[in-house]
Curated annotation (Swiss-Prot):
Annotated GO MF terms: glutamyl-tRNA reductase activity; NADP binding
Catalytic function, reaction form: (S)-4-amino-5-oxopentanoate + tRNA(Glu) + NADP(+) = L-glutamyl-tRNA(Glu) + NADPH + H(+)
Active-site annotation: 58 (nucleophile)
Binding-site residues for NADP(+), renumbered to this chain: 196-201
Organism the protein comes from: Burkholderia mallei (strain SAVP1)
Residue runs in coiled coils: none
Name the UniProt record assigns to this protein: Glutamyl-tRNA reductase
Main enzyme class: oxidoreductase
Site residues by UniProt (Important for activity): 106
GO terms, biological process: protoporphyrinogen IX biosynthetic process from glutamate
Oligomeric and partner information: Homodimer.
EC nos: 1.2.1.70
Amino acid sequence: MDMQLLTIGINHHTAPVALRERVAFPLEQIKPALSTFKSVFLGHPAPNAPEAAILSTCNRTELYCATNDRAARDAAIRWMSDYHRIPADELAPHVYALPQSEAVRHAFRVASGLDSMVLGETQILGQMKNAVRTASEAGSLGTYLNQLFQRTFAVAKEVRGTTEIGAQSVSMAAAAVRLAQRIFEQVAQQRVLFIGAGEMIELCATHFAAQGPRELVVANRTAERGAKLAERFGGRAMPLADLPARMHEFDIIVSCTASTLPIIGLGAVERAVKARRHRPIFMVDLAVPRDIEPEVGKLKDVFLYTVDDLGAIVREGNASRQAAVAQAEAIIETRVQNFMQWLDARSIVPVIRHMHTQADALRRAEVERARKMLARGDDPDAVLDALSQALTNKLIHGPTSALNRANGADRDSLIDLMRGFYQHAPRSSDTSDR
C-alpha cells in the first residue's frame, strides 16, 4: 500500500474545553508521546514506521501522520484514547479523521488561520512550526510530512500576503477587554493581575495596558521572566506563591500557564470574594488545561470566562471578512491539488527504483560475461556485439512478454503505452503486410 496522509484530532468546533484539556499534550510530553505512537505500529504488517507530528494548542489537539498501514485510523484513535485514559466511546464522537486531500486541506486552513477561533490569527502558524520542530527533533518526520509542512507554511504565507484575512480581527485578548468593560465601566480604575508570561499573556497585557489600569501586576513561576514582562508595561511582578494571600487585591485576573493542573481553586477564590466584601472579580482562563477550577464560575460575585466563552465575541467580528475567506479558500484549493499531484507522483518512485535495480543487475551480469570472453581471447568486436545483443534482448523481454500475454483492450492499451516509450515505433498503418 502507498503512503497515506492522515490527520486525527479534536478542536473547538468538535469538543468543549472540558474535553480538550484532557487530550492536550504539555510540551515536555510530545516527544515521548510520538515515540509511543510509533511503537503502536511495530507489530503491524506495514513495512514502514509512520511519520508523525503532534499539534497541541488551547483550541486543538491534532496528530498528523503518514503511513502505509490500512488500520492507521482506528489505531491512532485508540492510541489517543489509551494515552489520555479516556474511554474510546467518550472520545470518538468528538474526533475527526481526515485522509489524504482532506488532511492536506485541513493543514493549509489551520496554518492560514481559517480554522481558528480568531479568524486569520497568526499565533497558530508559530505553534505549528514549533510542532514540526519538535517532531523533527524526535526523529518522527520523513519525506511526506516534511513536504506537507513546508508547503503548508508557504500556503499560509501566500494567503496572508494576498488576502485581507487578518484585517480587523478581534483577538482573544481584545475580546477579554470587551468582556471586562461589560463588568467594569472603567477598566482604568481596576487592578489587573496576569498569571503567566507567555505569548497569550503578553498579548492580553498589551490590550489591557492600553486602557491605563490602576495597577498591572504579573505573577509567574519564573520570577525573572515575569518581572521583565511587567516592566515592559509599567507594572510590577509578584511571586506566584503569593497568589492565594493576595488574590483579593485584584479586580481582573487573566491566567494562561502551561500547568497541567488548576492553580486557582474554589476555596482560594471564595476567601478572596469574602475579603473583597463581595465586590465582583472578573476572571479569564485562557489555559488548556484550565488554570481555574470550573466550579469558581458558580460563585455569585465571580465572572469567569474560558477560551470558549471568548470565542462567541470573537465570532461576531468574523462575518465581515467572508470575501477574504472565499479568496483564501480558492488559493488553498489550488495548492491542495498541487500537493496531491506531488503525492501521486511519489507512488511511482518504488517502481522506478525497482526498474533501475533490475536493469543494473542485468548490466552487471552481462559485463561480467563479456569480461570472461575477453579474458579467454575472444575478438573484442564480437564481445561488444554479444554484450549489446544480450542487453537488448533482456531489456525488451519483459515488455515483449507482456504484449504477447495481453488480450483485447488490455493489449491495445499496452501497444499505446509502448509507442509512448519508444518514440520511433512505426504506426499501425506502417506495419501492415506489404
